[in-house]
Amino acid sequence: MREALQSLLVALQFLTRLPVRLSAMPTPEQFGRAVLCYPLVGVLIGVVLYGAARSLDGTPPLLQAALLLSLWVALSGALHLDGLADMADAWVGGLGDRERTLAIMKDPRSGPAAVVALVLVLLLKFGALAALLGAGRPGLLLLAPWLARSSLPLLFLTTPYARPGGLGQAIAEHLPARSLPWVLGVSFGLALAFGLSGLLALLVTLMLFAWLRSRFLARLGGTTGDTAGALVELTECAVLVALAL
């Protein structure tokens, strides 16, 4: 139980900006075990968003959507948005070359592709949030962060890490590979409790995952922290839009 709680705290500290205090810097092994808790972190983010949505009942849907999206970004500290921006720049500027793509991902500067990607994703999220809230379906907000963070363990489990060194490789080397399939099965299975909406969200998540993973392998031969962050943002966006249509 103590080890499970430690893994959850490490996952919360890594994936969110919630005030989690650890007694010491987590070891690579602890970072690896924490991947088991990524889906739960997604659920917690969804619960916070749902609670915020209910507390804003009566607020005009557009304003409510803007406030919730701001909270959503604040909860993650824009961690995954940063990965999306880096990947967008690298994919455009890399011109199909692996080493050039990896080099651009490490460049802290943002180019036009990064800005456009961020604007489009945030705009789509805002529109989908407004539609869901306007339709009185705030409970579906749970699905996007939950399934997006469930896709991360699936990515680490099935895809080699493309860049040597760093935290990403440490996580990849210490994955609890025997436990992860069970966790993923439970996480994806529970999404079906939302009925047809859950099934739709799950299908969108898995189809997008398969396509993005194939792109990562074709360009990089694996994944990186930036592509993992992009996977989260694009999955959240796709699930929200699919549910809002």
UniProtKB/Swiss-Prot annotation:
Pathway: Cofactor biosynthesis; adenosylcobalamin biosynthesis; adenosylcobalamin from cob(II)yrinate a,c-diamide: step 7/7. The chain crosses the membrane at residues 31-51, 61-81, 113-133, 138-158, 192-212. Its EC number is 2.7.8.26. It is an enzyme of class 2 (transferase). InterPro entries: CobS. It catalyses: alpha-ribazole + adenosylcob(III)inamide-GDP = adenosylcob(III)alamin + GMP + H(+); alpha-ribazole 5'-phosphate + adenosylcob(III)inamide-GDP = adenosylcob(III)alamin 5'-phosphate + GMP + H(+). One of its GO terms (molecular function) is adenosylcobinamide-GDP ribazoletransferase activity. It is found in: Cell inner membrane. Its cofactor is Mg(2+). Its main location: membrane. It is a multi-pass membrane protein. Keywords: Cell inner membrane, Cell membrane, Cobalamin biosynthesis, Magnesium, Membrane, Transferase, Transmembrane, Transmembrane helix. One of its GO terms (cellular component) is plasma membrane. One of its GO terms (biological process) is cobalamin biosynthetic process. HAMAP family: CobS (MF_00719). Belongs to the CobS family. Joins adenosylcobinamide-GDP and alpha-ribazole to generate adenosylcobalamin (Ado-cobalamin). Also synthesizes adenosylcobalamin 5'-phosphate from adenosylcobinamide-GDP and alpha-ribazole 5'-phosphate. This is Adenosylcobinamide-GDP ribazoletransferase. The gene is cobS.
